[in-house]
């Protein structure tokens, strides 16, 4: 079904992938920068020249070909997956959160006039793309990212009906060149993930590796910086910017298609450029420039006291940039990055935070990946806001990072989280 090139001689689906035993490691540092120049995580660099990847870039388009009416789609009905009106979603638990409603819903919240979105009931076909990069032999090598992919793929298969043939795993311990998490392979796999997606399909994207920031060139970031991820070959071909990930994986989706994304990387709070970010109270966050400007000045003072003059310059630049362009950037994101599809993102840290490469139960793992699976296993019938708080509670026992929940549309965070 999957049709991902490079597997089974160009046939369908990804093979069952075997992982070598992972050694036990002591607690690891943050998913800090694999920087080609300079020190710590979150360094800023200009985007590298874009290179062709063997596929033509689609022209700019409306989201999912959206014209206000969702297309009719067959119900794939994978065996064992519940209908949205059945008690199977909640195992008969009358206290469980309500399942997602059907039909189209108006955006509001400053979105483009006339826009509507559709929740997915996640009863259609299922595809997953899982990326884990340990950066073997490189500065900033990590130890838990491949384990994250192994753990997440098993969890999806055993608990959510994702078939092995419908999952593509890109990790840098594999011999097949098509399975290496190079920039070209990652972009190709992103296109594969969303290709031919229909309403009520459930797509899953997971990235565990290095993340960072680079200067924003299109004015859609409140802090003046885009979020980026680092392929295994980033030193040769550069990083992948959040704008490009949004264009490939969010923009083509029709109303009612679910994409669940998890980023276990530094500075990943808005890594898909989804405009609706929610607090642990389930309340939509809007930029508080006075508060954020104050935090920026605190960063200046902190950097100065530590003798970090580059940090002083960076914090001052961010402070003035945010104070003058934050509202404009937020409004532009609402107007240009809103989508009628059902895109949910869980990220391991805020845009200004690092994410931990940890050792838990004697296994190297990413903290966010571990916390998501742990929280879901403890209670698989949680609302969005309950799950966000559960993930934070798991992380709070060991780490300072704070996970983020963002969405492509205004979200009723009291609904049951499904995928």
From Swiss-Prot:
Q: Which GO terms describe its biological process?
A: apoptotic process; proteolysis
Which top EC class applies here? hydrolase
Provide the E.C. number(s) assigned to this enzyme.
3.4.22.-
Domain of life of the native organism? Eukaryota
Q: What is the lineage of its organism?
A: Eukaryota, Fungi, Dikarya, Ascomycota, Pezizomycotina
Could you tell me what this protein is called?
A: Metacaspase-1
- Which terms are listed as keywords in the entry? Apoptosis, Hydrolase, Protease, Thiol protease, Zymogen
Q: Which organism is it from?
A: Botryotinia fuckeliana (strain B05.10) (Noble rot fungus)
* UniProt feature, compositional bias: Polar residues: 83-95
What does the record give under GO molecular function?
Answer: cysteine-type endopeptidase activity
Q: Which gene encodes it?
A: casA
Q: Which GO terms describe its cellular component?
A: cytoplasm
Q: Residue spans with biased composition (Pro residues)?
A: 18-37, 45-61
Alphabetical list of InterPro entries matching this protein: Caspase-like_dom_sf (IPR029030), Metacaspase (IPR050452), Pept_C14_caspase (IPR011600)
Region ranges (Disordered) = 1-109
- Provide the coiled-coil residue spans: none
Annotated catalytic residues: 210, 266
Q: What does this protein do?
A: Involved in cell death (apoptosis).
What does the sequence similarity comment in the record state about its family? Answer: Belongs to the peptidase C14B family.
């Amino acid at each position: 079904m999957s049709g991902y090139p490079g597997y089974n001689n160009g046939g369908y689906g990804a093979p069952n992938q075997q992982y070598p035993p992972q050694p036990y490691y002591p607690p690891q540092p943050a998913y800090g920068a694999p920087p080609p120049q300079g020190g710590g995580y979150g360094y800023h660099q200009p985007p590298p020249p874009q290179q062709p990847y063997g596929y033509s870039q689609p022209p700019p388009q409306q989201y999912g070909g959206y014209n206000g009416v969702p297309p009719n789609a067959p119900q794939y009905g994978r065996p064992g997956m519940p209908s949205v009106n059945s008690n199977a979603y909640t195992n008969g638990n009358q206290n469980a959160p309500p399942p997602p409603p059907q039909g189209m819903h108006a955006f509001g919240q400053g979105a483009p006039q006339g826009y509507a979105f559709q929740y997915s009931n996640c009863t259609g076909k299922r595809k997953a793309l899982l990326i884990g990069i340990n950066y073997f032999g490189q500065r900033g090598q990590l130890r838990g990212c491949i384990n994250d992919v192994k753990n997440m793929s098993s969890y999806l298969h055993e608990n959510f009906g994702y078939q092995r043939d419908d999952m593509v795993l890109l990790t840098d311990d594999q011999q097949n060149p098509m399975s290496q998490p190079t920039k070209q392979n990652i972009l190709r796999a992103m296109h594969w993930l969303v290709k031919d997606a229909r309403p009520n399909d459930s797509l899953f994207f997971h990235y565990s590796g290095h993340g960072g920031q680079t200067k924003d060139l299109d004015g859609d970031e409140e802090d003046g910086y885009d979020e980026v991820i680092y392929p295994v070959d980033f030193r040769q071909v550069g990083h992948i910017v959040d704008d490009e990930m949004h264009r490939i994986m969010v923009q083509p989706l029709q109303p009612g298609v679910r994409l669940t994304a998890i980023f276990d990387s530094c500075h990943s709070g808005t890594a898909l450029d989804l405009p609706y970010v929610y607090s642990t109270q389930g309340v939509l966050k809007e930029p508080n420039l006075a508060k954020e400007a104050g935090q920026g000045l605190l960063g200046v003072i902190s950097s100065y006291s530590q003798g970090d003059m580059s940090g002083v310059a960076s914090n001052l630049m961010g402070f003035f940039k945010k104070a003058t362009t934050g509202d404009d950037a937020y409004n532009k994101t609402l107007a240009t990055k809103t989508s009628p599809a059902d895109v949910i993102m869980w990220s391991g840290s805020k845009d200004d935070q690092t994410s931990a490469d940890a050792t838990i139960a004697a296994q190297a793992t990413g903290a966010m990946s571990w916390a998501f699976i742990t929280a879901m296993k403890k209670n698989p019938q949680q609302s969005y806001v309950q799950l966000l708080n559960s993930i934070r509670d798991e992380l709070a026992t060991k780490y300072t990072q704070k996970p983020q929940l963002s969405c492509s549309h205004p979200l009723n965070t009291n609904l049951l989280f499904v995928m």
